[in-house]
Amino acid sequence: MKDTSLPSTAGAVNKLIDSLGKLPGIGPKSAQRLAFYLMRAPEEQVLTLSDTIRSIKNQISQCRICFNVADSELCPICQNTKREANKICVVEQPQDILALEHVGVYRGYYHVLHGAISPTEGITSQNIRINELMSRLNDGQVDEVILATNPTTEGEATAMYLSRLITPLGIKVTRLARGLPFGTELEYADDVTLSRAMEGRQNF
């Protein structure tokens, strides 16, 4: 990783710049701007931010049903009994749920795998939440599983694997429509493209 420290800057500031620079999407210049902004910001604002970041590690866990992020036993979506219980949308990461919920065209439940099958990285079906998904399908309530893994090599491999497991159960398996460019992560797709991909999902 590129060194973001500044020789002419105090050690504590350099430490903050270095820490911010380790965040995804934050380059050296952005890290420096954020660090100097935080130095000028009111103390209350900085302390609130610090407490919020700390609470994420101390209070946030995973929903026991879908493995979305949650601050109690169940995430807000799984607590909502008005959603369509016959549909489960399978995603790779919790942030994919945020993208789909923002579009507002899907009213079923979710299942977060926390990854995708990737032999090159040593990630197999046993390393992600596939067994838990199959257990959820045993209650007979679900009649459609929507595979919303990313349109990447790993996402496609995971979707194919899941389809082979789920289809023999007599459950309809669909995949988001091909409007999403290959290699794109779901969380970065625009609302219109994502909406069309969900509404135009196809048998898989």
UniProtKB/Swiss-Prot annotation:
GO molecular function, one term: DNA binding
Keyword terms of this UniProt record: DNA damage, DNA recombination, DNA repair, Metal-binding, Zinc, Zinc-finger
Keyword Endoplasmic reticulum carried by entry: no
One Pfam family cited in the UniProt record for this chain: RecR_C
GO biological process: DNA recombination; DNA repair
ZnF C4-type span: 63-78
Keyword Metal-binding: yes
Domain Toprim: 86-181
Family: Belongs to the RecR family.
Task performed by this protein: May play a role in DNA repair. It seems to be involved in an RecBC-independent recombinational process of DNA repair. It may act with RecF and RecO.
HAMAP family (alphabetical): RecR (MF_00017)
Name used for this protein in its record: Recombination protein RecR
Gene name for this UniProt entry: recR
